[in-house]
Amino acid sequence: MSIIKSFSVGLGDMYYIKHGSENFTMIDCCLKPENREAIVKEIKEEKKGKDITRFISTHPDGDHIQQLDYFDDEVEILNFYCVKNEATKTSETNSFKRYCELRDSSKAFNVFKGCKRKWMNDDGPDSNGKELGSSGINILWPDTSNEEYKAELQKAKDGTAFNNISCIIQYKLKNSVTAVWMGDLETNFMESIKDEVSLQKTNILFAPHHGRKSGKIPQEWLDTMNPDIIVMGEANSKDSDYASYPNHNKIRQNSAKDITFECESGKVHIYSSNENYTADFLTNENKSTFDYYIGSMDV
């Protein structure tokens, strides 16, 4: 069994995966003074006892690294996964300064399409001979030889744009869930690389760019993934791309607030921190592991 948690952090992203193996994964950071103590406390508690912890930064846009310095000071990031980049910003926040420190440190591992790493997607023993198991995470993008991607890396180096250096992350739990994150990839860029990314049936898709119209997913990708649920981020209603996915079930984070996915063999049970949130496409299996169960789905 594993737990996927999507925090409600406004116009930003922050997640963790508590794996059934000896792994704990955090994806992106968006903290504020009013939420940071509670979120950090939860992450500290949930990662207790895990031998391998990693933080994956999809890209260095401000709402994905917000208060990363505070988070790192409190949690202590030991393994920092990011795409290889030389992003700069004219006005450097403490968050971006910490991102650069981690990016350029010995803690960094540069992710790319098809990369292998022990305990990320390879099993193996630790230095004491203990078998830790794989996290089930694979990186589907970027292809670092792709010319369109190289152009986006240059924009990041010039400090003009960062969204399209986002990596695509896939998490697979054996006989259970497949989930995909796409950072803040934008529609035009996704269209330019749509034949370069190998996707498959997906149960939970976290919509790129917080569910904005600017992150509309290519139809070819949607057809291939055929997601059971698309989680729409907290984009403003005027920017939301909700109407572009009429044939897919959706959970709106701006209504559901924190979303917890309890993933077990053949099933995903879903909980919302909003006790009044409902999702009529889910079945009721009367689960109660967490507060405010909203339903389950077969996977």
Question: PLM features: what roles do these ranges have?
Answer:
Residues 25, 33-87, 196-212, 223-230:
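Active-site metal-binding motif and surrounding structural segment of the metallo-beta-lactamase
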Residues 65-74, 90-100, 217-220, 241-246:
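Metal-dependent catalytic neighborhoods of phosphoester/phosphodiester hydrolases
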Residues 35, 39, 64-67, 92-102, ...:
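Stable alpha-helical elements in mature extracytoplasmic
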Residues 1-50, 113-201, 257-299:
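Core dinuclear metal-dependent hydrolase active-site scaffold
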Residues 106-109, 117, 245-252:
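Active-site regions of enzymes building and remodeling cell-envelope glycoconjugates
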Residues 56-60, 64, 82-86, 92-95, ...:
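Divalent cation-coordinating acidic motifs and surrounding scaffolds
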Residues 97, 197-260, 264-269:
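Long, structured stretches of catalytic cores involved in phosphate-ester chemistry, encompassing
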Residues 11, 32-34, 60-65, 87-90, ...:
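Active-site environment of divalent metal-dependent phosphoester hydrolases
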